A protein has these predicted regions:
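Helix-to-loop junction immediately C-terminal to a conserved catalytic motif
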Residues: 36
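Conserved ABC ATPase signature
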Residues: 119-123, 127
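Conserved ABC transporter NBD signature motif
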Residues: 44-52, 64, 97-102
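A short, proline-enriched helix->beta-strand linker immediately N-terminal to the Walker B motif
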Residues: 138-142
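The feature captures the beta-strand-to-loop junction immediately N-terminal to the Walker
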Residues: 21-23
């Protein structure tokens, strides 16, 4: 069995935007999958809100305040935009608060409001990325994990997506961002970690790393 990551240690402070950058196969997505409970590490711990996530089933991590926007968007193509968004709120019970969150998501993503009854599979790539982000925000997360949000998008959509990530951060949500577009990620991050073959080889303030090429 290939070991994708080894000896990785990093921290994310509340309210930060943290970027994990590196080439394909560096282990970035594996880290996100491990943090969100999709993979179980052989050893080590992942602490969130004072609890070790390794000991908590993945499906319960969402209700603790963590949301994951997967690589490739992974929207439910045969469901409407609205149905996709409501899937993001499945751990929540208060209908009034869910409705308020939905309005906030629609304010942030006007295209989704316009297309709320449209099948998700008919949206453009950029719109599907917005939907995946909106779906994650419907869980009202404390931290949101984003995996390659710029993948396959036109430059215009990339700029729009990164503007929205900054808005999400400013609203108080912590962001852990995996991104191959290093310059774009570093331009909005507070701090960053650079991965090579499953190990962190560089870390520091994003502005310092951006100027360091």
């Amino acid at each position: 069995m290939i070991q994708a990551i080894k000896g990785v240690s990093f921290h994310v402070n509340e309210g930060e935007v943290i970027a994990l950058i590196g080439a394909n196969g560096a282990g970035k997505t594996t880290i996100l999958h491990t943090v969100s409970g999709l993979l179980t590490p052989k050893e080590g711990s992942i602490t969130f809100e004072g609890q070790d996530l390794v000991k908590i089933p993945g499906h319960k991590i969402v209700s603790m305040g963590m949301a994951h926007v997967p690589e490739g968007r992974r929207v439910f193509a045969q469901l409407s935009v609205l149905q996709n968004l409501m899937m993001g709120a499945y751990t929540r019970k208060d209908k009034e608060e869910i409705a308020q969150t939905l309005e906030t998501v629609f304010d942030r993503f006007p295209r989704l409001k316009e297309r709320q009854n449209q099948m998700a599979g008919t949206l453009s790539g950029g719109e599907q990325q917005m939907l995946a982000m909106g779906r994650a925000l419907m869980s009202h997360p404390k931290i949101i994990l984003m995996d390659e949000p710029s993948m396959g998008l036109s430059p215009i959509f990339v700029n729009e997506i990164f503007d929205i990530i900054q808005e999400v951060s400013k609203s108080g949500t912590t962001v852990l961002l995996v991104e191959q577009n290093a310059k774009k990620a570093l331009s909005i991050a507070d701090r960053a970690y650079v991965l090579e073959t499953g190990k962190i080889v560089l870390e520091g303030k994003a502005s310092d790393l951006l100027n360091n090429d």
